[in-house]
């Protein structure tokens, strides 16, 4: 069986100018123009300009010495430990918008392997931080708003997708869910940023386990405009109209999805209201 192991992959890479100082403090990373400056300050590697219109900026660490970063949204932040790599994305045609996407690969634990109990402790620490820093549950605008009472049912039936951020699994529940899914998935937002977290168990035997975490941050300005075809060619009035059409279409799709989920025994959280992303899109 092939096991995903970013520790081993990273260790096999040749040394590069982009390897980070292993003893540095937490690196602050922002979106927008400040984000470009953050990457430039902490990396000697040139921007990777791709023909498809995306510019990539990266930071890397060599295990076993891993990094720490703090990613800032408009209103909060998230601190990430045991970081292996950070990839920041700038849209070339909208270069003045700066960094719009950040993908971060990290280990859940500081050593290459850990125990189930230690991994569980690290999971609870992550969930506490999510709540303490007021990240909120995010449903994609076309997806069903599943009620919190169906959290465990939803996790086991959808490969670990969490819908109640305030609920911390017991150790037994943690073991039971992972035995069925091998992962947990969080969909969050805070201010101008949406965040997907995928926590995966990548190895397990009788003595040790390994967990990797992917943090995918996306600015709502990019996400909103990217959902609209040719948004860059529109004036402000056309963009507003296209955005409203997109919202209406999403509502129709959501209604259909929620009706389907009700047939499967799920409850819908009618109180959930989508974040207003228009101020960021326009």
PLM region descriptions:
Residues 170, 176-282:
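C-terminal interaction module
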Residues 21-23, 30-48, 117-141:
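Amphipathic alpha-helical segments
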Residues 12-15:
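Bacterial signal peptide processing site
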Residues 1-4:
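Sec-dependent signal peptide recognition
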Residues 8-10:
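C-terminal motif of bacterial Sec signal peptides marking the signal peptidase cleavage site
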Residues 85-165, 181, 207-244, 248:
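Long, charged/polar, surface-exposed segments that mediate recognition or autoinhibition
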């Amino acid at each position: 069986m092939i096991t995903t192991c970013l520790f081993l992959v990273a260790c096999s890479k040749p040394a590069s100018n982009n390897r980070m100082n292993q003893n540095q403090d937490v690196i602050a990373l922002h979106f927008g123009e400040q984000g470009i400056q953050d990457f430039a300050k902490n990396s000697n590697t040139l921007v990777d300009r791709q023909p498809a219109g995306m510019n990539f900026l990266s930071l890397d660490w060599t295990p076993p010495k891993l990094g720490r970063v703090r990613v800032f949204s408009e209103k909060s932040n998230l601190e990430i430990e045991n970081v292996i790599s950070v990839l920041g994305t700038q849209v070339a045609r909208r270069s003045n918008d700066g960094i719009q996407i950040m993908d971060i690969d990290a280990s859940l634990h500081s050593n290459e392997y850990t125990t189930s109990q230690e991994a569980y402790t690290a999971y609870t620490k992550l969930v506490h931080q999510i709540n303490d820093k007021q990240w909120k549950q995010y449903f994609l605008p076309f997806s069903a708003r599943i009620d919190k009472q169906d959290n465990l049912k939803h996790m086991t039936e959808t490969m670990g997708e969490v819908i109640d951020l305030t609920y911390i699994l017991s150790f037994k529940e943690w073991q039971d869910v992972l035995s069925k899914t091998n992962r947990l998935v969080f969909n969050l937002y805070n201010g101008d940023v949406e965040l997907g977290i995928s926590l995966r168990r990548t190895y397990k035997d009788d003595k040790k386990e390994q967990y990797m975490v992917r943090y995918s941050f996306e600015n709502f300005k990019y996400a909103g405009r990217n959902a609209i075809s040719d948004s860059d060619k529109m004036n402000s009035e056309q963009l507003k109209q296209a955005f409203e059409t997109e919202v209406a279409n999403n509502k129709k799709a959501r209604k259909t999805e929620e009706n389907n989920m009700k047939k499967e025994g799920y409850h819908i959280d009618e109180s959930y209201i989508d974040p207003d992303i228009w101020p960021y899109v326009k």
